[in-house]
Amino acid sequence: MTAGRRMEMLCAGRVPALLLCLGFHLLQAVLSTTVIPSCIPGESSDNCTALVQTEDNPRVAQVSITKCSSDMNGYCLHGQCIYLVDMSQNYCRCEVGYTGVRCEHFFLTVHQPLSKEYVALTVILIILFLITVVGSTYYFCRWYRNRKSKEPKKEYERVTSGDPELPQV
């Protein structure tokens, strides 16, 4: 096995994993995701651990969380205030559809129905594709038949061995 082939086999498994990690990192950076603790089933949601990435510290760290003090009740606009014990900071657990440091940004997802022009264009392109496939198949079949009919047929002749002792077939 050559060195290039070995390197290709090693990279084949690692490149998709690296791209996946890069995709998650970019998704977090672009959407400015907030802290979403993942409590273990049976663990109290008032005191569990979460993976947190802050603007000041881009590393992901595991921290303990508790509820915020009563004076921080209005801190989160659309979510629940949580206190990160290990970092001594307040963060928000946003409601579904909200994001941001204080859950102030709303994700407005609008699903627009397909326009008639888009549907018509799609149908036309599919029909053109099918016509191309059928036409190519027809052309190939005719070419193959013409080529086969133009070849002279090979007729087999009886060949004798020339040896009188051998039986002739």
Swiss-Prot record:
Attached carbohydrates are found at N47
What InterPro entries does UniProt report for this protein, alphabetically? EGF-like_dom (IPR000742)
- In its UniProt record, which GO terms are filed under biological process? anatomical structure morphogenesis; angiogenesis; animal organ morphogenesis; cell-cell signaling; cytokine-mediated signaling pathway; epidermal growth factor receptor signaling pathway; ERBB2-EGFR signaling pathway; ERBB2-ERBB4 signaling pathway
| Molecular functions (GO terms) | epidermal growth factor receptor binding; growth factor activity; receptor ligand activity; transmembrane receptor protein tyrosine kinase activator activity
What is its biological role?
Ligand of the EGF receptor/EGFR and ERBB4. Stimulates EGFR and ERBB4 tyrosine phosphorylation. Contributes to inflammation, wound healing, tissue repair, and oocyte maturation by regulating angiogenesis and vascular remodeling and by stimulating cell proliferation.
Source organism superkingdom: Eukaryota
Disulphide connectivity of cysteines: C68-C81, C76-C92, C94-C103
What positions belong to the pro-peptide in this record? 30-62, 109-169
What name appears for this protein in its UniProt entry?
Proepiregulin
Segments spanning the bilayer are: 120-140
Organism lineage string? Eukaryota, Metazoa, Chordata, Craniata, Vertebrata
Q: What is the effect of changing G42A?
A: In a breast cancer sample; somatic mutation
- Per the record, ranges on the Cytoplasmic side are 141-169
What species is this protein from?
Homo sapiens
The protein's assembly and partners: Interacts with EGFR and ERBB4.
List UniProt keywords, sorted A-Z. Answer: Angiogenesis, Cell membrane, Developmental protein, Differentiation, Disulfide bond, EGF-like domain, Glycoprotein, Growth factor, Membrane, Mitogen, Secreted, Signal, Transmembrane, Transmembrane helix
